Amino acid sequence: MVAVLAAQTTEDRILDATERLLAAMGLRKMTMEDVAAEAGLTRRTVYKYFGSKQELAFASIDRVVSKVRDKLEDIAVSDSPVQVRLKRMALARITVRLEAVQSYRMSLDSVFEVIRPAYMERRKEYFRREAEIFAVVIREGVGSRRLKPVDPDETADLLLQATNAFLPYSLSPDELGRTAEVKKRLEAMADIFVAGISK
């Protein structure tokens, strides 16, 4: 158990260092040596966990997506009414991501430029797992007649598609810097969507 915790701590140190370097120099200029120095580790230790800087970028994204799923699951099982949960979930899937990339928002385009082809495949799985969580809540709402008799899986997919326009890689660095404005627009969209499927 102690060894597992130590491994997680080292991995987090490496990923924290990666995100600081992404803010400072972007993915193209960043080297594994830079990451090791920033994390206060040997290059060998970094390579033990990650084989390349592309792997580091994906691990950083995976860490954010994991936080998103945890937040969605927490909201999904809360005691709030279905409509409130759906709105909070729609907001959370974006705001958790926005907050996570703030430090390196100016270099986010360069990150996706390097990893985009592989990322596009990977994000299908991210979205599929998020949609499953939304579908559970929608199914509950349909069953309790608080929501219209919509198809839960299809509606969950539509809700994700509607909010994808607010994902960090869909926004400019300037928009990413105006999170309050983005959140306001996102909230308005979520209100419209949830109202549209509510009885």
Task: Describe each region flagged by the PLM.
Residues 40-50:
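Short hydrophobic/aromatic patch on the recognition helix
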